[in-house]
Design a protein with these regions (language model features):
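Solvent-exposed soluble domains appended to multi-pass membrane proteins
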Residues: 1-147
Length: 147
């Protein structure tokens, strides 16, 4: 990381670098680590289970961008957030994501959080989540296809 940042620090071209790991180790690896610490899945609290799905990230730029520290977010928003902070115009899909983030700051396979901080089941937010899933599918697989 240090070498990469040092290289771009004085570059003339505006540069944004995102350091992000997409998940924690697999269950097989995590089970071994837990066992070596006298723990098992059966004895983890709900909060400890959730921590497995939290991954730190760092956004660095060689110019001033809007910064946010310690924000709870989810991977589906990260690209749109970085582009917005970098001053890059967002396409319609990423604009939609930034709007959705105001209502649901976290959407993941294991938890969905509303703007007020309350956790909800995605299945209980069916209408909004169905729209999101359809748009996400279109963006990933059908982009440019006329239906």
């Amino acid at each position: 990381m240090e070498s990469l940042i040092s290289y771009f620090k004085d570059a003339d071209e505006k540069t944004v670098i995102v350091f992000f790991g997409d998940h924690q180790p697999s269950d097989a690896v995590a089970s071994t680590v837990l066992a070596k610490n006298g723990m098992s899945w059966n004895h983890l609290t709900e909060e400890q289970q959730k921590l497995r799905y939290q991954v730190p990230y760092v956004v660095w730029a060689n110019y001033d961008i809007d910064e946010e520290t310690g924000a709870d977010t989810s991977a589906n928003y990260l690209a749109a957030e970085v582009l917005e902070r970098a001053g890059v115009p967002l396409d319609e899909y990423r604009s939609y994501l930034m709007h959705l983030k105001t209502e649901y700051p976290v959407i993941s396979a294991v938890r969905t959080v509303k703007a007020d901080g309350s956790e909800v089941r995605a299945s209980d937010e069916k209408d909004e989540m169905d729209i999101y899933r359809k748009l996400q599918y279109y963006e990933l697989f059908d982009h440019g296809t006329v239906n």
